[in-house]
Amino acid sequence: MTLNAPKVKVPKLKIPKIVGLPKQASTALTETRLTPPDYILGLDMSLSATGWCLYNVKTGVRQERVLQPNPSASKKVVPILGMHRLVWLRERVTNLVLWGAPERPPEGARISCLVMIEGYAFGAKGSSGISLGELGGVTRVALYDLNVPFIEIPPTQLKKFVTGKGTAKKEHMLMEVLDRWHEKFFDDNICDAFSLVQLGRAVTNTQEGNLLAHQKEIVSDVVKAWQKDHPAAA
C-alpha cells in the first residue's frame, strides 16, 4: 500500500528591492538623424518654374518663391533659352545656397545649408527630358563644386512622406500640406519645395511634432542612404 505524502505549503518569499542598481538598458533601436544645418533649402527644379523654399533652422523664418527665367509671355521680350537658361538657373540656385537669396547681397555672408532636391521624374520624353536632365546635372555639379551637401529625393518618396502614398497627385499633395502643416499653396512647385524642407527637418530632427509611421520609414531610408553614400560623415 502506498502512503500519500502530506501537502506542505511553501511560503512565498518577498525579494527586497535593492536601491541604487541601474535599470536594464533598453534594446530599442535609437533613431539616427543627420546634424542640423543653419538652413534647409528645398528645390523642385524646372526649366520654366523652379520652386524653392528656404528655412532658417535657428529662427524658424521661411521664405519661398518660384524662379522663372521667362515670366513674360510677350513676344516683345526675348526669352532665355538653351545654355543661357541653364546658367541663369545655376547662378540663382548658387546664390540661394550660399547667401540665402536669389540675388547675391552686396555684403552677404556664406550660410550653412542642406539642400533637399527632388529627383528626376522619368515621365518626360524627347527634348524636354533631355533638357531636364541637363538642368539636373548642372545643378548637382554646382552644389558638388561648392561643397554643399544635398540629398536627392525621388518624387514617389516625397509623395509618400507627405500623403502616405507614393502615387499621390498634385492636388492631393496640396491638400495634405494644408491639413498637416496648415500651409496653403496655390503653386505645386512651391508646395513640393516646402514638402522637401519638411523632410529635411525630419532627417535632421528639427521638425515640429511627432512623425507618422510612414514618415519615420521614409526618414530612416533617407538617413541610411546618406550614410551609405557618405561613410566618412556618418
Where are these regions (language model features)?
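Phosphate- and other anionic-substrate recognition elements at nucleic-acid/protein interfaces
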Residues: T2-A234
